Amino acid sequence: MLTRALGTQGLTVSALGLGCMGMSEFYGHRDDAESTATLLHAVDRGITLFDTADIYGPHLNEVLVGKALAGIRNRVVLATKFGILRDPANPSVRGVCGRPDYVRSACEASLKRLGFETIDLYYQHRVDPEVPIEDTVGAMAGLVKAGKVRFLGLSEVSPATLRRACAVHPISAVQSEYSLWTRDPEDGLLQTCRELGVGFVPYSPLGRGFLTGQIRRFEDFEPGDYRRNSPRFQGENFQKNLDLVARIEDMAAARGCTPSQLGPRAATSSPSPAPSAATAWTRTWAPSTTCSAPANSRS
């Protein structure tokens, strides 16, 4: 497995990571035994970067990932996140919080659920518009000083906010949705990451699983799957995106791989102006198979 250096502080991870959100909710039924087997299989195939968050489950995902990786802690880089709040009585109701006291308490809670002494990469999941980023990152920097966190990251951040954050403490990674159908980071964020020496971690490089080519009908989404309520998968949008998948399937076939393998490669080897490691999760993804470019073409 190829590796990538994220940031300039010494964080090195596998070029492909495993995003664990879908193991606990959002994408239909959960199967903890299957998820645990997937986590261990990923390690065996050379993946070192594993991504979770306190709200996934909520909280269940950190427990699952922590238990699965406990015996091989020294072989993995564990990333988790704080900052999105969910109402336990109504999980669809959400808010954000970046207050310094919350940063510290959220970290302690995540460490307890994971069963780890240190979080390798700690992201602010979403920026709190009511709290200056300097205050939030200042509290995160305190966690580094205390030995509870090794490296800092931000998720879905603007270039301007990233600059302010880096002035407080080095940011090793920025995470944002980026795939063959989501190109927003190309509008300034990738360039800012390169300028500041910040690594870039694309999430959902498989387009919420849609770019795998395994979804053909709206009915393919299980009851309770959040994609049933997403505008991307409604009405004529569904068919337009199916048309895009057909083109991606042709591209993958020309390169001797599957759409599931093409997506992460595209997210990390497009003209990305920053070191990148993609995180993805799907039951059909086979990360051990490489995807090669056909003769006389550019990958």
Regions found by a protein language model. Give the residues of each.
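Short, acidic/polar
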Residues: R30-A42, G98-L114, S158-R164
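Active-site groove signature of glycoside hydrolases
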Residues: L111-P129
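Beta/alpha (TIM)-barrel catalytic core signal, keyed to glycine-rich beta->alpha loops juxtaposed to Asp/Glu
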Residues: V127-R298
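A short acidic, helix-capping loop that chelates divalent metal ions and anchors anionic groups
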Residues: G22-Y27, L85-V93, A280
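Conserved beta-strand positions
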Residues: L18-C20, T52, L121-Q124, L154, ...
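Alpha-helix N-cap and loop-to-helix initiation/capping positions
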Residues: R30-E34, L60, L64, R94-Y102, ...
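N-terminal binding-site loop/beta-alpha segment at the start of enzyme catalytic domains
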Residues: M1-V77
